[in-house]
Amino acid sequence: QKYFANTEGSYIDQDIHRIWPNFTVTAVDPQKGKFQTRDALSAPMGLGWDYLSARPESKIAGVTTRYGNHYDMLEDAAAAAQQAREKHASKSVEPGKYDLVLDPSHLWLTIHESVGHPLELDRVLGYESNYAATSFATLDKWKSKSFNYANRLVNLFADKVQPGSLGAVGYDDEGVKCKRWDLVKDGILVNYQAIRDQMHILGERESHGCCYADNWSSVQFQRMPNVSLAPGKENLSVQEMIKGVEKGIYIIGDGSYS
């Protein structure tokens, strides 16, 4: 439960649900003295216990089952145990150059680090450098309107309104109504994540609504909202995506962080 009031006349009461059921399975080979792990394929969500209802329609078939808005923790734990054991017999990846195909359960981290943090305007301005440093996506690149952040097929957006997402709320911690906006459009850098006291720098009159404090006693400041890769125009299966990859690695889940 979050209650917000300010001297401008805002009185906002929000009931916010968040859940992240998580685990790590460790398989030990006592003869070799080695161990392998496999983490859960769950996701942090803006949902309640209904996320654990394990509905069949939320299961995504593949080399391992992945999950949408409902998660089967027992099924995933059993698969994790088997796959952790299988990793003991797996070959190491040979050094070299590979094409990568990243499942959303892994891609989220790539987006978080390579797009989310660099496009936090406080890092761009040098106000913040904790953990993820400052940013290469400087204001001159944005002002040029031609900085290629990614391939022209790539569209990335920020929001705090996707139903069921971890960052979804009605209003941020400055009392600003949340919304969605573009960060990268057709591969070009078009915007940042910014709050009320930063918007004049971007020539905008309205905050993006991504201000956050982790506690009533903490000072709220600009924090990363949901940052997402927009789907492509073609609805491709994994098999269709990888059929043209001659030397590549397909990654599901994350075994480490940045």
Functional labels for PLM-detected ranges:
Residues 15-19, 94, 148-150, 221:
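A short, structural micro-pattern
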Residues 57-60, 129-258:
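Dual-mode signal for accessory low-complexity, basic/Gly-rich regions
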